[in-house]
Curated annotation (Swiss-Prot):
N6-acetyllysine PTM sites in chain numbering: K22, K33, K137
Predominant localisation class: nucleus
Record-listed Phosphoserine modification sites: S142, S248
Entry keyword Phosphoprotein: yes
Annotated protein name in UniProt: General transcription factor IIF subunit 2
Subunit text: Heterodimer of an alpha and a beta subunit. Interacts with HTATSF1 and URI1. Interacts with GPBP1. Interacts with GTF2B (via N-terminus); this interaction is inhibited in presence of GTF2F1.
Gene3D superfamilies membership: Winged helix-like DNA-binding domain superfamily/Winged helix DNA-binding domain
Species whose genome carries this gene: Mus musculus (Mouse)
GO CC list: microtubule cytoskeleton; transcription factor TFIIF complex
PTM-bearing positions, type N-acetylalanine: A2
Function statement: TFIIF is a general transcription initiation factor that binds to RNA polymerase II and helps to recruit it to the initiation complex in collaboration with TFIIB.
Record keywords, A-Z: Acetylation, DNA-binding, Nucleus, Phosphoprotein, Transcription, Transcription regulation
InterPro entries: TFIIF_beta, TFIIF_beta_HTH, TFIIF_beta_N, TFIIF_interaction, WH-like_DNA-bd_sf, WH_DNA-bd_sf
Annotated compartments: Nucleus
Amino acid sequence: MAERGELDLTGAKQNTGVWLVKVPKYLSQQWAKASGRGEVGKLRIAKNQGRTEVSFTLNEDLANIHDIGGKPASVSAPREHPFVLQSVGGQTLTVFTESSSDKLSLEGIVVQRAECRPAASENYMKLKRLQIEESSKPVRLSQQLDKVVTTNYKPVANHQYNIEYERKKKEDGKRARADKQHVLDMLFSAFEKHQYYNLKDLVDITKQPVGYLKEILKEIGIQNVKGIHKNTWELKPEYRHYQTEEKSD
């Protein structure tokens, strides 16, 4: 971009409001496959008991996923995506576009933030399972050598990077936070195996700090406070794809 350029403030003058929406990676990849200015789906905005409900439905033509991580695959992407609406939080966020002639235009000011999430379904669970399996495959492969390795390495009690890692781990005194989407993937994968988990087991599975894990669990799960499953967590109804077991008080 040029150091000096023309700035079109039409969007600011018209007080144009825009939404800033986070979408899953697979959804943006499917959108990119749409030809020309074709339709990628439908956005529905409705009122339910005074609350705004927003959802996106992906076009059926774009639902087929043919590769995952560069590997051939055959799976259908979830079509229904409810929005989780979030406030702007006192921030002033703006959207700019840049033309081929380096002209900047202010398109509008962000008035609403949201996260577009897939509705829990068999298709979504299958897609996440394939993604998790692909990401867990080793990137290094064993190879048979034709020649004898002549380089001599002396054994050491511990490597320097291991020493540094252990030192940092002791200094931190806590687990490092992983990406939120990665934690969600691990949780959904765990809840495919069992309906109920106590917090300690979920901490062991995800290797996440307790406070951070509980923040994420509150978005997708329910903590049981009574009955035979007291003090355990399970998925909220909208994220389940199994038959709910009967609870007793």
